[in-house]
Amino acid sequence: MALQDILSVSDLNRYIKLVLEKEPHLQDIWVRGEISNFTHHSSGHMYFTLKDKQSRIKVVMFASYNRFLRFLPKDGAKAIVRGSISAYERDGAYQFYAKEMQPDGLGSLYLAFEQLKEKLAQEGLFAAERKRMLPRFPKRVGVVTSPTGAAIRDICTTIRRRYPQAEIVLSPAVVQGADAPASIVSAIRIMNDQPDIDVLIVGRGGGSIEELWAFNDENVARAIATSLIPVISAVGHETDVTIADFVADVRAATPTAAAELAVPHYLEWVERVRQLEIRMHRAVRGTMTEQRNRLTRLGNSYAMRQPERRLEEAAERLDRAHLRMRQSMKHLLDRRRERYTRLDEQIKRYRLADQIGEKRKNLSKLRATLDERMLGRLNQKRMAFAARIATLEALSPLKVMQRGFSLVYTNDRLVKSVEQFAPGDEIMVRLSDGSATARVEKVNREEEKQSGSQKNGTRD
């Protein structure tokens, strides 16, 4: 045995892996079995064992594939898995690498149904507050279903019989099989792009659970939930319940029932219009009777018996209102006029600023001239005043008394004549340096010409 024929463990495992991956019968195959030892790792990858009564195989399903699963795998569930066989080099063990997985059998379908139902319910897609009201008088009714099935015939017949003026717009879709979910989603989106679609019917006729399974698809449910048009689900018969029924705004037991919910019956509305007409006539008659009675009461009232007086009162109120309006206008105009006057004065002051400056200069010159002239005039007056003071001082009685003369008073009055007193009267003689009191003993008049008497009086 040559040394070059000896393989390492790694080389051997790598070769086994290469052989397995090149074998066409081990690639892209379906395997049925029961799930056990299921683990959903934090990385998102799934690890489990697929077994039957005689054997088992380890299975790996990476997160990039298992995120598309329509159900949550668990131990004991039967499943059909699509994938390929390969080897894990480190352990030298072959295992099945899954790319797709579906529940196997009706029990698994029911499990997938319940799991999706719970998931969407937790997201609030079934909440009553999300449900929208259907339009009462739709003009265009959209339908998503098979163009060749009985459902479209039942819907068209019912709508044309009940409400012939409504237009039916069909968006054809595959309603069963592997291609059905994508086809239904596409048809719903196409219908949402159409103008003026008032209500949308999504459904099909009856069938087995497998045939109806497209309406339990998560993508279909989300397309219905996000539709801008109110949706009526109509899948199968009354006993058939799908995820689409929970998500739709209204659930109909059959396609025929969906058509009846979508449009009103014209005879029902004819009867309703007739009833409304009767009610309207009654209301009009009642209103007319009430207004007629009111008119009669008004005609019999005091005010209507003397309309001239009412007109006079109204005219008086009008005159008063007119007077108040004129007064208000006058007051307003006065205020505006006063304001404009103030503004005009302010403007004038601003315009006269330069003139005021010029006048101020002229005034300064005039003040200087006036001061000069007044000073000259004041000097003249001062000199004249001094001359008059000198004259007055020369003529002053005090000056005369300083030369030896005196003033005689009787009863506080200056004596100018001997006729003012008689012998025995008390007199006061005022001299330049004081005064003296004397008594008259004798009065000599000038005409008596007595010698030795003094000219203006006799001394005591």
From Swiss-Prot:
Region (Disordered) residue spans: 438-460
One MF annotation (Gene Ontology) recorded for this entry: nucleic acid binding
Bias-annotated ranges (Basic and acidic residues): 439-450
Chief place where the protein resides: cytoplasm
Compositionally skewed regions (Polar residues) per UniProt: 451-460
Example GO BP: DNA catabolic process
Pfam families: Exonuc_VII_L, tRNA_anti_2
Cell compartments where the protein resides: Cytoplasm
Reactions listed under catalytic activity: Exonucleolytic cleavage in either 5'- to 3'- or 3'- to 5'-direction to yield nucleoside 5'-phosphates
One Gene Ontology cellular component annotation held by this UniProt entry: cytoplasm
UniProt keyword annotations, A-Z: Cytoplasm, Exonuclease, Hydrolase, Nuclease
Assigned EC number: 3.1.11.6
Cross-referenced InterPro entries: Exonuc_VII_L, Exonuc_VII_lsu_C, OB-fold_nuc-bd_dom
Family recorded in the similarity comment: Belongs to the XseA family.
Purpose of the protein: Bidirectionally degrades single-stranded DNA into large acid-insoluble oligonucleotides, which are then degraded further into small acid-soluble oligonucleotides.
Quaternary structure, from the entry: Heterooligomer composed of large and small subunits.
Protein name (record): Exodeoxyribonuclease 7 large subunit
